[in-house]
Swiss-Prot record:
Main location: endoplasmic reticulum
Lineage top rank: taxon: Eukaryota
SUPFAM superfamilies on file: NAD(P)-binding Rossmann-fold domains
Key words, A-Z: Endoplasmic reticulum, Fatty acid biosynthesis, Fatty acid metabolism, Lipid biosynthesis, Lipid metabolism, Membrane, NADP, Oxidoreductase, Transmembrane, Transmembrane helix
The species this protein was found in: Botryotinia fuckeliana (strain B05.10) (Noble rot fungus)
Pathway noted in the entry: Lipid metabolism; fatty acid biosynthesis
BP terms from Gene Ontology: fatty acid elongation; sphingolipid biosynthetic process; very long-chain fatty acid biosynthetic process
One of the record's GO cellular component terms: endoplasmic reticulum membrane
Functional note: Component of the microsomal membrane bound fatty acid elongation system, which produces the 26-carbon very long-chain fatty acids (VLCFA) from palmitate. Catalyzes the reduction of the 3-ketoacyl-CoA intermediate that is formed in each cycle of fatty acid elongation. VLCFAs serve as precursors for ceramide and sphingolipids.
Binding residues for NADP(+): V56, D113, D121, N140, Y207, K211, V240, T242
Keyword Zinc-finger: no
The protein, known as: Very-long-chain 3-oxoacyl-CoA reductase
Active site: Y207 (proton donor), K211 (lowers pka of active site tyr)
Compartment list: Endoplasmic reticulum membrane
Amino acid sequence: MVLDTILPKAVLTGLAGIGAFIVAGKVISYIQLLLSLFVLSGKNLRTYGKKGTWAVVTGASDGLGKEYAIQLAQKGFNIVLVSRTESKLQTLASEIQTKYAGSNIQTKILAMDFAANRDEDYAKLKALVDGLDVGILVNNVGQSHSIPVPFIQTPKEEMRDIITINCMGTLRVTQIVAPGMVQRKRGLILTMGSFGGWLPTPLLATYSGSKAFLQQWSTSLGGELKGTGVDVELVLSYLVTTAMSKIRRTSMFIPNPRTFVKTTLAKVGRSGGAQKMAYTSTPFWGHALMQWWLENTLGVGGSFVVDQNKGMHQSIRTRALKKAERDAKKA
């Protein structure tokens, strides 16, 4: 070979060894991914409390939050439902109590507008959960942009609401609930993350930044609470068929809320596709395979990936604006 005449045999052997080491690392990583997704089970939720222990779910009236509440009730947890619309909370509470009447599942509700960030609302939440044996907190409350929008055109109110709801709301609720968990030496804090925070996302810059903040905060909190008996996990997801995503059809990469939540609760403590992030899980297999492929091929923050992400959201914005224009003409 030509290389034999240019490079010493020892150098070629060394390069071959490095290549084999890299390939072996990728193979092992992929095997670990498959085991985490399809073979190994997650932590038993009974670890966080016996039947009748409470779970607090924010953003509980629709989508993923509603599904978390229903499935946790099915597993024997009493549920504290927190969201903005009281009528929806009352309907869900009645649905849960009727559906699981034989299990004596209890519910409590609190209607609060997280965008308002009112001290009195958080005082009510504290009064509601004080004295309850809360074993699980699901930080699901969140808001995105109405449609993809350039940052410099983002309405100030929308920008403020996203940061206040996604960041301050999550932090303040956790600060109320977590001390009791630490005192009881058991608990699970699940926070909903997003691929929008993992991948830099042009035209969703404020939302992307808020979810990236939650990633760093949750991982830091996990490090702080290690050894206390309280588990912290940020759950990464790509698209799910919810009102926020405005997607109705499921696919290999887009589950419905029921499937996504069922997988998440079954895989607590398993990293799934989030192999390079402590205290983080990407539990749904379609999302996890996508994450692994990107991290091991194109990378996450490179210009090519960012440009592709921008193109996708520019297309979504264009279609949304055309639809709004058509609807305006019909009105």
